[in-house]
Amino acid sequence: MIWHVQNENFILDSTRIFMKAFHLLLFQGSFIFPECILIFGLILLLMIDLTSDQKDRPWFYFISSTSLVISITALLFRWREEPIISFSGNFQTNNFNEIFQFLILLCSTLCIPLSVEYIECTEMAITEFLLFVLTATLGGMFLCGANDLITIFVAPECFSLCSYLLSGYTKRDLRSNEATMKYLLMGGASSSILVHGFSWLYGSSGGEIELQEIVNGLINTQMYNSPGISIALISITVGLGFKLSPAPFHQWTPDVYEGSPTPVVAFLSVTSKVAASASATRILDIPFYFSSNEWHLLLEILAILSMILGNLLAITQTSMKRMLAYSSIGQIGYVIIGIIVGDSNDGYASMITYMLFYISMNLGTFACIVLFGLRTGTDNIRDYAGLYTKDPFLALSLALCLLSLGGLPPLAGFFGKLYLFWCGWQAGLYFLVSIGLLTSVLSIYYYLKIVKLLMTGRNQEITPYVRNYRRSPLRSNNSIELSMTVCVIASTIPGISMNPILAIAQDTLF
């Protein structure tokens, strides 16, 4: 009898919860419409996979790409609408969040055609790969719009779990397995530290979980300058540091870059940084408003360490992917300058502008690496020697993307860094900007070293990989070359689009 009553109560409670969730989705689902499009695409992928054979493989790519493009379109139509808080405070919709969601969707849209040929050559499972990419994209989008501590914790875990699975997708590769294990262990440790910081923030604010309500709670409890807030700040900075991978939280980055499939590295190298930057900006700027001096100091230390260590260690690398791993550590140091400057002096606008250029530069470089790797099977920097003699288009594309990453004028990377450093200088961050300028010059050295190898025509320096290099038919690689061409153009011709990009970025206020 008791069991029967408890069972009825459980059914009633479950029904109420389901009806409440259905009510929220029905009346507030429009606020997360771009995310709903991706969810629909995921369901459609699963249904087609269950009911079709291998001949329908092109449909998988088409559905994934189409859902991403439609989601981008939905975001653009919603641009400049009034900020809205929905789902009982779980999500916030505003220009700042939406532009980061747009960047994540853009990354995923460019990464899918970049992966097609690689998946077919390595005989990887297509459906699962695309499901993981779309789910990670969905997690990143939810993270950008998250407005409470629970969602901010759950959304990156959704992204991270898919990232772990993607990095270990080539199960027979020992390096991939090792990289995945390191990634998983360090990711789990960082998540526990992050949630520990959230618990201190929750307790100090009197039990509040929404970001703005936490500020009000700290004022009411007079705990905004307490030791508990300092513990929360340090713990959350460490937890977010793993996602952003600045020094000294970069230990996982080189191994994961080297061991993971190259299209996966391309995807993770940009989406993780975009999502984590959006989350870090909002968490530090809103709940830790009264501790701005403290978190500015912490981020300045991370930025200096990242710019110096990342660029110095990149010089010594022999693997192209490991070199880009250390380069990305240096690049996140530049992005942190924009976070420190904040909304004053266009800090966020400069950060967003540089991230947009970084996406094109980085994905363009990885597209070239994927193409070269498929045709030669090597990742060693020395094996790129003389590539210009065999494939001028690929060599020039790689050279332009690398030089743009280094910030050589008149490429996009130069304008992005110029705007970022100028905003930092205007905000009084003279030492930080000076370090950024010096390390940028240092990065040009190792990028130019690779460009010199690409353009060499001496037979004694050309390796057997390039001597036996054979270009594949254009039809078989057109998807990779399409992504590569788009990224190269975006990395080299910023002048036409610079002013509109800056104007849009300057509108991204909270």
UniProtKB/Swiss-Prot annotation:
PANTHER family noted in UniProt: NADH DEHYDROGENASE
Record's subcellular location: Plastid, Chloroplast thylakoid membrane
Function noted in UniProt: NDH shuttles electrons from NAD(P)H:plastoquinone, via FMN and iron-sulfur (Fe-S) centers, to quinones in the photosynthetic chain and possibly in a chloroplast respiratory chain. The immediate electron acceptor for the enzyme in this species is believed to be plastoquinone. Couples the redox reaction to proton translocation, and thus conserves the redox energy in a proton gradient.
Pfam families recorded: Ndh2_N, Proton_antipo_M
E.C. number: 7.1.1.-
Catalyses which reaction(s): a plastoquinone + NADH + (n+1) H(+)(in) = a plastoquinol + NAD(+) + n H(+)(out); a plastoquinone + NADPH + (n+1) H(+)(in) = a plastoquinol + NADP(+) + n H(+)(out)
Membrane protein topology class: Multi-pass membrane protein
Record-annotated membrane-spanning stretches: 31-51, 59-79, 99-119, 124-144, 149-169, 183-203, 229-249, 295-315, 323-343, 354-374, 395-415, 418-438
Gene Ontology process terms (BP): ATP synthesis coupled electron transport; photosynthesis, light reaction
Descriptive protein name: NAD(P)H-quinone oxidoreductase subunit 2 A, chloroplastic
Entry GO terms, CC: chloroplast thylakoid membrane
